[in-house]
Structures are given as C-alpha cells and as structure tokens.
Amino acid sequence: MAEPAKKKPKKLPKKDKGQKDIKRKKKESYTVKIYIFKVLKQVHPDIGISSKAMGIMNSFINDIFEKLASEASRLARYNKKSTITPREIQTAVRLLLPGEVAKHKVSEATKAVTKFTSGA
C-alpha cells in the first residue's frame, strides 16, 4: 500500500538586510471592566465575579455601546446633522432596547444629564 505524499512545509520569503518588519496595528479595545466591578460592589458588596463572566459583561457593554453609537450616527445623518445630540442617543435607545427597559433607561439618562449639567 502506498503512503500518502508528504507535503513540504512552506518557507517564508527571506528578508533583505535593509527591509524592516511590518508591524500590524492592534485593534483598540475599550474595557469597562473596572466600572462594571465598581457598580457590582455598589449594588452587591458581598458578591464577586469571575474573570470569564467579567469578559462576557465587557463584551456585552461594548456591543450595546457600538450599536447605540451607530444608530445615533445613522439618525444624525438622516436629519442632515453633523453632531450627535442627546436627542439622537435617546431615540437610538428607544429603537434598540425593548419597551420597559427603554423607558427606564431614558429616565435614568435624563436624570444623569440633569445632575451633570447642574454641577452636583
């Protein structure tokens, strides 16, 4: 019985002495793990979170943020505006989040913006 032909490993092309390594840009990753942990400790001081669960929460927050930002951007473009205002963010929240969750988040955001602008 004949053995299957073995493939030779591919060799990388050799570099000239004057040629430099090409560095790839690392994709920027925004992490909110610290803030998730701070909120967890405010709400439930006696509960911890595993690193795997923290990674999932971080991905979830980044995903929601990305979706809200792109939806708000789309709304600004539809209205021929070059600036995303709180109104676009609020509308994006209403479009992306379901019913009661959207109402709750809009009221919380309004409260936070009011607190921020009053300087308290």
From Swiss-Prot:
Give a short account of its post-translational modification: Can be acetylated to form H2BK6ac, H2BK33ac and H2BK34ac. Monoubiquitinated to form H2BK143ub1; may give a specific tag for epigenetic transcriptional activation.
Q: Which Gene3D superfamilies match?
A: Histone, subunit A
Q: Which UniProt keywords apply?
A: Acetylation, Chromosome, DNA condensation, DNA-binding, Isopeptide bond, Nucleosome core, Nucleus, Ubl conjugation
Instruction: Give all Blocked amino end (Ala) modified positions.
Output: A2
* Any one Pfam family match given in the protein's UniProt record, by short name: Histone
Cross-link Glycyl lysine isopeptide (Lys-Gly) (interchain with G-Cter in ubiquitin): residue positions = K115
Listed name of the protein:
Histone H2B
Q: What is its main location?
A: nucleus
Listed GO CC annotations: nucleosome; nucleus
Q: Subunit composition?
A: The nucleosome is a histone octamer containing two molecules each of H2A, H2B, H3 and H4 assembled in one H3-H4 heterotetramer and two H2A-H2B heterodimers. The octamer wraps approximately 147 bp of DNA.
Q: Which organism is it from?
A: Pisum sativum (Garden pea)
Q: Does the keyword Nucleotide-binding apply?
A: no
GO molecular-function terms, A-Z: DNA binding; protein heterodimerization activity; structural constituent of chromatin
Which gene does this sequence derive from?
HIS2B
| Membrane among keywords | no
